[in-house]
């Protein structure tokens, strides 16, 4: 057997490979047959796996290990098999397994079900929250979305966070509205004695319903008929009753200045206007009261002179002027108290001497002017040119 092998090797030229292993059945050992089967399986691997292994290229007829019997046989003839022995020492490492990249979600699920836990936390979070978002859009989410709490501090539900932020903003807005209402309500809580003394806070102008009450309809059928022969007091009292006008002295001045006949004619015109729907005020927000309609017709009647109208409303305009002056004085008094309180809380040591002196002089002048306004009790009466015309007698009640 050895002589045949040598003879065949002698026939092979340098650089050629011997096919003795394929021509001679049974010549190889079981280890060599196993190596052949391994070579066959390696040849069927994907081309991508062989590239990604990163090992240098080797001839395909190489063996993984050298058998001791083969080494002893090859050592007997060093000259003929030296090149073969060197080539047998090259090892063919098995290429590393390179799994293809999962292109779809089903592959990832299969990998996760295979026993290996995939560390894809944010992918799971995104999937859960997308499901919650879809359920919310469909309107089938009647409760808070359940989220996996196994991640503890890494758990974050952006839908729940948005809901909580919205609730916090609504709560803050309600709190601000409540504080504003309390502030406005406290502003109106002033005692009458303090208002008379000018020591209370300003009271805001009341609404129309608070000042005028519910609108009363005109009483078309009075208590009795009135004529020019009746006295002025009787005519004025009946007109005030039918108009539901509380200011009877104003109606009495109207009857006295323009006469009983003209006053009764204006009453009939007022009844006709009220039956047709009434009159609106200038801005159109509400209808005039029957007394307001009566006074409006009085001012717009050409036969009534302007001097007569000024004489009728002189006392009312004078009261309104005094009320405005008193309101202005009260505002100045409240402002002075706030200024004094603010000055006491200032720390003027932080500024230089010149700034402190200037501030002190300006403050003293302002406080002195406030004291002068508070001490002055004499009010000059208005001239006829300063009289303010009004549309409704009820609008004179400012406070």
UniProtKB/Swiss-Prot annotation:
Span list, region Disordered: 1-83
Stretches with biased composition (Polar residues): 37-53
Composition bias type Basic and acidic residues, residue spans: 1-10
Compartments (UniProt record): Nucleus; Cytoplasm
InterPro entries per the UniProt record, alphabetical: PHAX (IPR039047), PHAX_RNA-binding_domain (IPR019385), PHAX_RNA-binding_sf (IPR038092)
Electron transport found in the keyword field: no
Alphabetized GO MF terms: RNA binding
A matching Pfam family: PHAX_RNA-bd
Biased composition regions of type Acidic residues, renumbered to the chain: 11-22, 68-80
GO biological process, one term: protein transport
Transmembrane spans: none
Family under the similarity heading: Belongs to the PHAX family.
UniProt function note: Probably involved in protein and RNA export from the nucleus.
Matching PANTHER family: CYTOSOLIC RESINIFERATOXIN BINDING PROTEIN RBP-26, PHOSPHORYLATED ADAPTER RNA EXPORT PROTEIN
Designated name of the protein: Phosphorylated adapter RNA export protein
């Amino acid at each position: 057997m050895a002589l045949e092998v040598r003879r065949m090797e002698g026939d092979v030229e340098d650089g050629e490979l011997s096919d003795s292993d394929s021509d001679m059945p049974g010549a190889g050992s079981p280890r060599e047959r196993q190596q052949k089967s391994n070579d066959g399986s390696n040849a069927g691997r994907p081309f991508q796996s062989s590239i990604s292994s990163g090992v240098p290229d080797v001839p395909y007829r190489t063996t993984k290990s050298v058998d001791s019997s083969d080494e002893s046989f090859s050592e007997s003839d060093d000259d003929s098999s030296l090149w073969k022995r060197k080539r047998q020492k090259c090892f063919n490492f098995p290429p590393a397994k390179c799994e293809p990249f999962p292109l779809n979600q089903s592959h990832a699920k299969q990998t996760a079900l295979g026993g290996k836990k995939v560390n894809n936390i944010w992918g799971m979070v995104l999937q859960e929250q997308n499901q919650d978002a879809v359920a919310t859009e469909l309107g089938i989410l009647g409760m808070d979305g359940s989220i996996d709490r196994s991640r503890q501090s890494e758990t974050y539900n952006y839908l729940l966070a948005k809901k909580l932020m919205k609730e916090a903003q609504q709560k803050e807005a309600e709190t601000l509205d409540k504080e504003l209402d309390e502030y406005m309500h406290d502003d109106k809580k002033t005692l009458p004695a303090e208002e008379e003394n000018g020591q209370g806070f300003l009271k805001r102008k009341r609404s129309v319903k608070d000042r005028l009450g519910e609108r009363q309809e005109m009483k078309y059928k009075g208590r009795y008929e009135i004529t020019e022969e009746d006295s002025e007091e009787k005519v004025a009292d009946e007109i005030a009753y039918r108009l539901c006008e509380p200011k009877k002295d104003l109606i009495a001045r109207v009857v006295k200045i323009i006469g009983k006949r003209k006053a009764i004619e204006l009453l009939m015109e007022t009844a006709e206007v009220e039956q047709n729907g009434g009159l609106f005020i200038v801005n159109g927000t509400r209808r005039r009261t029957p007394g307001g309609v009566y006074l409006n017709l009085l001012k717009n009647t050409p036969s009534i002179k302007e001097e007569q109208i000024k004489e009728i409303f002189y006392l009312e305009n004078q009261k309104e002027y005094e009320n405005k002056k008193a309101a202005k004085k009260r505002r100045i008094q409240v402002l002075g108290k706030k200024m004094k309180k603010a000055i006491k809380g200032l720390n003027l040591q932080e500024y230089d001497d010149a700034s402190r002196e200037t501030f002190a002089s300006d403050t003293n002048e302002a406080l002195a002017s406030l004291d002068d306004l508070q001490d002055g009790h004499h009010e000059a009466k208005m001239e006829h040119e300063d009289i303010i015309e009004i549309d409704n007698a009820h609008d004179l009640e400012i406070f």
